[in-house]
Amino acid sequence: MGEKCIKRDCLHLCFSYMSGKVIIFPVESNTAHVKVTPALNKIFFSVTVCLRFLSDYNKEQAPGDGRYRLYIGDKGVFFYGLPTGLNQWHSVCVTWDSGTGLAQIWVNGRPSARKALQAGASIAGTPSIMLGQDQDAYAGGFHVYDAFYGHATDVHMCDTVLSPSEIKDYMKCVISRPGNVVDWTNMEYSKHGYVIQENITLYTK
């Protein structure tokens, strides 16, 4: 299925069937991003976010030592020893549960140790979901050294912790449980700045 777009105030507002599409952030920028409108507006006590990415980003701020960092609110935790190879597609799923406070990252089918992060907390208010930028403030606070520089696809977000079998399916490019907050195959979004959308068939996952 195709993409329906209108142009308003120099901004493309799209409602897209994104299956088979990839978003490219081709330059380091503090403006280029994709804003995603969530399908649910609620208080979140658990989440799973999955995506696939490819990049050759390797700066001092991202030393390429298998390190990933997850934030819930203003608290973060590092996960180590996971795949981060340059110019390779990586499938990533992140889970967090408020009840137990446990967070985990899966990369290319490999699960991290589960670590404590913000037990009893919640994610309240309208979610501000941005692809390509790190938000140091709600819907803003972008810095070029925090920006994503590369390709991204298959973004899904659920309001629950997916099971290991569901995550393993995702790692095999099988979407057994599409996101009910963000579903890459059917989401409303807007592109800002230098952002390109192409067919994933031009690349190798």
Residues of each region from the PLM?
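Extracellular glycan-associated modules
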Residues: 1-205
